[in-house]
UniProtKB/Swiss-Prot annotation:
PROSITE patterns: COMPLEX1_ND1_1
NCBIfam families: PRK06076.1-2
EC numbers for this chain: 7.1.1.-
Any GO BP annotation: aerobic respiration
Species, as recorded: Sulfurimonas denitrificans (strain ATCC 33889 / DSM 1251)
Name of the protein this chain belongs to: NADH-quinone oxidoreductase subunit H
Top-level EC class: translocase
Length: 328
């Protein structure tokens, strides 16, 4: 039993890494297409039918590019920083149930690496550790733009980690568990049982904080092209830069799964329709990340901090108090 469980876990880890690494590349294709559509352009069209092979071309380019390490960088930290970003993104996925359980060849498969009873806390903790990727990469790069990016990243991520944690306290109080599977079961009665209806404020707060956690527009301060070039990634090239890129897009997919499971019923009763519904919700939230980049400008760092500490955090605290009073 222990050997089969170990083998199953290894297979799950490999499948998650392979699928979401590929989805990171595919996500860039859809991002280019969405941005092009909204800006009245064509996007990728030349490499393969409808430009679909552009992803493969970009992958080959990254693998074959020279791995340049500038002279004055702090070598070991510079090299390990991209690994931290990619590794923590996939580590956070261990507590996410991507689909309902299903049976194949008489063997029941649970599409989650580990259903730990502190799943949400684990995910938030690992995402917090992921901050060290851009932070160390920027500090070790011996580049003023990278250093500014690292400072911005530390301020943004640490601040919005607080908002993220406070926003989900109210739903946790209602469900009485930190497991995402328990959250799904709590909402399995149907669309009327979704937590978003009873906790709309928590949903909005968590969704806003998700943009800061993933470093996406309008909170794209750590790699703001017109201010600090590519931010912490300015001195990186080849697959080291690619690891930062994979970590960012994998986080977008994972946070979309978490939002869908926390607030929008997840996969419901575990049926095929529920599984397809979960994937549709994830696709919508991923599209929303792309749409926001096309529609919104970046905001200033001081505006971002003002929004966090003077608007979102007080609202989150008030929401917790109101939820506690209602539940008494």
């Amino acid at each position: 039993m222990e050997a089969s469980y170990f083998i199953e876990t290894i297979i799950k880890i490999v499948v998650i890494v392979l699928i979401f690494s590929a989805l990171a590349g595919i996500g860039t294709y859809f991002e280019r297409k969405v941005l092009a559509f909204m800006q009245r352009r064509l996007g990728p069209v030349n490499v393969g039918p409808f430009g679909l092979l552009q992803v493969a071309a970009d992958g080959i380019k990254l693998f074959t590019k020279e791995d340049i390490v500038p002279t004055n960088v702090v070598g070991r930290i510079f090299k390990i920083a991209p690994v931290i970003t990619a590794a923590t993104a996939f580590m956070a996925a261990a507590a996410i149930p991507f689909l309902p359980s299903f049976t194949i060849f008489g063997y029941e498969v649970h599409p989650i690496v580990s259903d730990i009873n502190i799943g949400i806390l684990y995910i938030l903790g690992i995402m917090g550790v992921g901050l060290y990727g851009p932070l160390l990469g920027g500090m070790a790069s011996a580049n003023k733009f990278s250093l500014i990016s690292a400072a911005r990243g530390a301020a943004v991520f640490i601040s919005y980690e607080v908002v993220t944690g406070l926003s989900i306290l109210a739903p946790i109080m209602m469900v009485g568990s930190l497991s995402l599977i328990d959250f799904n079961e709590y909402q399995s009665a149907g669309i009327t049982s979704w937590i978003v209806w009873t906790q709309p404020v928590a949903f909005i707060l968590f969704w806003i904080a998700a943009f800061a956690e993933t470093g996406r527009t309008p909170f794209h301060l750590i790699a703001n092209d017109h201010e600090i070039i590519d931010g912490f990634g300015t001195e990186y090239s080849g697959m080291r830069w690619g690891l930062f890129f994979i970590g960012e897009y994998a986080n977008m997919f994972f946070i979309s799964f978490v939002i869908s499971l926390l607030f929008l019923g997840g996969y419901g009763d575990g049926s095929l329709l529920g599984a397809l519904g979960l994937l549709a919700k994830v696709a919508f939230f991923f599209f929303f990340f792309l749409w926001t980049r096309a529609a919104w400008p970046d905001i200033r760092p001081d505006q971002l901090m003002w929004l966090c500490w003077k608007v979102l955090m007080p609202i989150a605290l008030i929401n917790i108090v109101i939820t506690a009073i209602v539940m008494m």
